[in-house]
Amino acid sequence: VYAPVLVEPEVLLPDNKACMRLPGIDGKAKMSKSLGNCIYLSDTADEVRTKVMSMYTDPEHLQVSDPGHIEGNTVFTYLDAFSKPEHFERYLPDYANLDELKAHYQRGGLGDVKVKKFLNNVLQEELEPIRSRRAEFAKDIPEIYNILKKGSDAAREVAAQTLSEVKSAMKINYFEDMDLIKAQSEKSVSYTHLRAHETLANLVC
């Protein structure tokens, strides 16, 4: 309406649908602290392993020889989100990729334990750098607050500049717009001059 100051943000969503929302390890709609079905970034390696091995899979996959379902199978949902070709090279070289692993599970002959162990290796590799970094930061809490303060100050500075541009576009930056101040000053002079003539005219009359 006023000026092209604010840019409409674009929606950014991952191509991998599994990344949009990970279900809880019990197969519920989402991870929930109250349900206790979360894997936390602060979890130890043992805690992650325990949670992965307790993950919800296919309730009908009772025997290794039974064909399994990957739809609604939490373990495969997590593998969709996190597994990479190099993970298979390191931890499961019998399979070239996730599609081959899924196909084997669906036709039967692949147990849940083997798939869960693979997922655990994948998650441990992804989480270890985060876990180590977090441990380093935890050694110096004042530095964390210092980093947060610097970030807040920088964000506040950018926000102030944006707000100034918005006010300028809306002509409400009364204390910064010199053109507006000049225009108001000229208007005030003209009004005062007019009132002065009215007063003199009234005196003459």
Predicted feature descriptions by range:
Residues 1-124, 183, 187-191:
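Active-site cores that bind ATP or allylic diphosphates and position pyrophosphate for catalysis
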Residues 192-199:
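Conserved small/polar residues in nucleotide/adenosyl-binding loops
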Residues 100-110, 129-154, 158, 162-181:
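Short His/Asp/Glu-rich catalytic/ion-coordination signatures at enzyme active sites or charged loops
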Residues 204-205:
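Hydrophobic alpha-helical segments, chiefly the membrane-spanning helices
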